[in-house]
């Protein structure tokens, strides 16, 4: 497919001219296309609505991947955290960059077609309808509310009809015309001055735009939520609070805490969608402050650290499963939900920071099996009931040091696992680490709270052999280890699997790799400008398959603190957000 576009001029704005190319040939994206993506396209953040991170393309295979060559690369102008999850449609790559920038690139050549910049790009009706960044930006955030970590990271975007959707660092959802990059609408869902912001982008489910918010760590008279919106207008259709309020179902699980002191339960990773059941599945994060003793309750604290099944048209809660009731070490379970049918059972697979693989029934939320990988030292989990019990001495007390694996950075984080139907296996980026942690008190006042003071001393996992990075491969449904690959540097991207019997990942030390998905043999590697970081994808244009691997900086935990502490000999440039695209030679 040849990508057709024409050059036009958006006009003078802020004293400069903005050149814009318009996409001429563009097929509106439908619900059917999202459910069954055309071969070679990448229309959802993980390739399909089940969040597999899998490409059915096999032109690049385990037999020829060692011939991969760089076709083009593109660097972002903006500094900030880069964790891009690109989309591909009609030969165009739509990619989010730092600070709310979205660009459309010719996916075969890397040429820029258009660019959207918050507060600069005009709206489609020739007015500037963007929210005022001077009023809503970081400078307006009171120190007591500013959430800092991860702010400005836009992981994924969504595409539907003729619009691109993004959730912003200023607690807004934006719709951009996919042909021109012009702003169509912008809806603010919360007050960024209270610390609210987005890192997870939207998904589309049965014609509704759904996304969850973050920035809920500080005490305020409001809580975190997931919302559904009309994709044409941005109108909010429903809102589900991810913290149970006093007097509502589950409200007593926070004890006697007033609503303003019930913090956390952010939903900062995008969800999945089951079209037949018409349910979206979202994870939620931990309660805050992290430690029970600091937040003032030892209750379960619904709906923290849970998987939620919501009707995308109404926001009604169909079921929930709380993985870690009353969690007390910052062990998130917010991450991706992977939908797989195994042995006639329609299942969800997910893994949190503790490296426990949970298998749930998609219809009922019933636990099918919990499999502890054996890396963590904090708690015991019953594999059939899912009940957890904390090990002796592992419930934090204020001012008392505990020795725990993993650290608060976790074994698993936002770097999403991938599923391959060829091998019936999950490919999971893991970082092996432990921590000496001392939790301190915090004051229960508006604007206070947060994670709570924590003194942290990271150290290598005793069973890691000095390695920080691991690609863990589990057979499904047995959850037995199929193979694992370990190295000194952390694996720093999501995993990508393909029908060519391949799995791709990248690391903190600027390397990108391809492995034989069946055997674990390393078949190809290359090195790029800075740390590999983000969500790799694969696509096809004019019968040619491409592999796109993002690089970037910023973020927290694996991206900065752990390598600095545990692999000080490894270095990287402090900027260089970019995308690198590879293909076989002609």
Predicted regions and their residues:
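Aromatic (tryptophan-biased) beta-strands that constitute blades/sheets of beta-rich domains
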Residues: 22-76, 111-146, 182-191, 235-242, ...
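Blade-level signature of beta-propeller repeat domains, shared across WD40, Kelch, NHL, RCC1
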Residues: 537-586
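Loop/turn-rich, solvent-exposed surfaces of beta-rich toroidal or solenoidal domains
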Residues: 430-432, 457, 462-521
């Amino acid at each position: 497919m040849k990508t057709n576009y024409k050059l036009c001029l958006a006009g003078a704005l802020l004293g400069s001219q903005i050149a814009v190319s318009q996409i001429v040939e563009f097929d509106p994206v439908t619900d059917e296309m999202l459910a069954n993506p055309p071969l070679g396209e990448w229309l959802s953040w993980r390739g399909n609505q089940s969040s597999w991170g899998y490409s059915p393309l096999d032109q690049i295979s385990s037999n020829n991947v060692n011939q991969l060559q760089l076709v083009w690369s593109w660097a972002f102008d903006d500094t900030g955290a880069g964790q891009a999850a690109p989309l591909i449609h009609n030969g165009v790559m739509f990619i989010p960059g730092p600070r709310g920038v979205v660009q459309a690139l010719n996916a075969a050549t890397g040429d820029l077609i258009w660019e959207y910049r918050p507060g600069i790009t005009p709206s489609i009706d020739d007015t500037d309808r963007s929210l005022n960044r001077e009023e809503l930006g970081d400078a307006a955030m009171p120190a007591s509310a500013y959430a800092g970590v991860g702010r400005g990271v836009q992981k994924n975007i969504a595409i539907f009809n003729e619009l691109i959707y993004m959730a912003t660092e200023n607690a807004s959802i934006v719709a951009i015309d996919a042909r021109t990059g012009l702003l169509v609408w912008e809806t603010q869902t919360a007050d960024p001055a209270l610390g609210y912001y987005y890192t997870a982008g939207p998904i589309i489910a049965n014609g509704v735009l759904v996304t969850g918010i973050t920035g809920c760590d500080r005490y305020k008279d409001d809580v975190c939520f997931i919302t559904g919106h009309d994709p044409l207008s941005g109108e909010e259709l429903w809102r589900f609070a991810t913290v149970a309020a006093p007097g509502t179902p589950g409200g007593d699980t926070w004890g006697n805490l007033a609503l303003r002191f019930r913090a956390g339960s952010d939903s900062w990773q995008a969800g999945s969608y089951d079209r037949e059941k018409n349910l979206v599945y979202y994870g939620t994060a931990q309660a805050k402050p992290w430690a029970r003793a600091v937040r003032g309750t030892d209750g379960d604290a619904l709906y923290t650290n849970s998987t939620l099944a919501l009707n995308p048209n109404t926001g009604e809660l169909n079921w929930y499963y709380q993985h870690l009731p009353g969690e007390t070490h910052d062990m998130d379970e917010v991450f991706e939900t992977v939908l797989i049918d195994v042995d006639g059972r329609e299942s969800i697979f997910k893994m949190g920071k503790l490296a426990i693989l949970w298998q749930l029934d998609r219809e009922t939320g019933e636990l099918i099996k919990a499999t502890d990988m054996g890396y963590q030292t904090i708690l015991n989990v019953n594999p059939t009931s899912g009940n957890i019990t904390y090990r002796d001495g592992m419930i934090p007390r204020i001012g008392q040091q505990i020795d725990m694996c993993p650290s608060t950075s976790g074994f698993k984080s936002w770097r999403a696992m991938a599923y391959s139907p060829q091998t019936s296996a999950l490919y999971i980026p893991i970082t092996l680490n432990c921590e000496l942690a001392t939790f301190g008190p915090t004051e229960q006042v508006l604007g206070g709270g947060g994670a709570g003071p924590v003194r942290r001393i990271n150290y290598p996992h005793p069973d890691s052999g000095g390695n920080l990075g691991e690609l863990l491969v589990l057979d499904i449904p047995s959850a037995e280890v199929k193979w694992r690959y370990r190295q000194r540097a952390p694996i720093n991207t999501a995993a990508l699997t393909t029908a060519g019997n391949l799995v791709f990942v990248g690391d903190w030390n600027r390397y990108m790799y391809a492995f034989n998905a069946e055997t674990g043999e390393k078949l190809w590697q290359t090195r790029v400008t800075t740390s590999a970081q983000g969500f790799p994808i694969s696509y096809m244009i004019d019968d040619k398959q491409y592999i796109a691997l993002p690089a970037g900086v910023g973020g927290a935990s694996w991206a900065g603190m752990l390598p600095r502490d545990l692999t000080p000999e490894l270095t990287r440039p402090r900027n260089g957000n970019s995308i690198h695209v590879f293909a076989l030679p002609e």
